C-alpha cells in the first residue's frame, strides 16, 4: 500500500467503530492518541491537518509530546548542542506514561470514562489497534497490562525480548 501509516491506522480504528455500531452496542469512542517528539510535533500535526485527519473526527485525534532526556557520551558526560545548550533526545517508548499524565490526556481519558488504552508503535503497519480479541482476553484475565509479541526470527536478531528481570516481566534489549 502507498498509504501513509497514519491513514492505515485511522482506517483500522474506523472499522472497529463501524463494527461496534453494527453489533448494536453503545457508541464506540476510540480516540487516537499520537505521541510525538518535541522535534516532530508540529510536522505530525500539520500532516494530519493536511490530510483532513484521514477522515477521523478532528476531536478524536489527540497529540501529546513525549519528554526528552540529556544526551551523554559513553563516559557519562553531557553533550552540548551548542555553547551552553545541552543536547537532548526523546525519552523513548517508556516515556508514554509520564507524557500522558503531563499532557493532561490521562485525566481527559478518565473524565470520559475510558478504562483501558492500547499502546503500540506507530511504525508497525501490522498492528491491530484496540484488537477486540486481545483487549477482551486481557480484560477477562483482569490483567493490568498485556503484550503481544512474536518470536525472534534468529537468535542474532537485534530486538527486545520478553523476559523476567528482577522477578518482573520486562523487555530486555
Annotate each PLM feature.
Residues 1-173:
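Domain-scale recognition of functional cores that engage charged ligands
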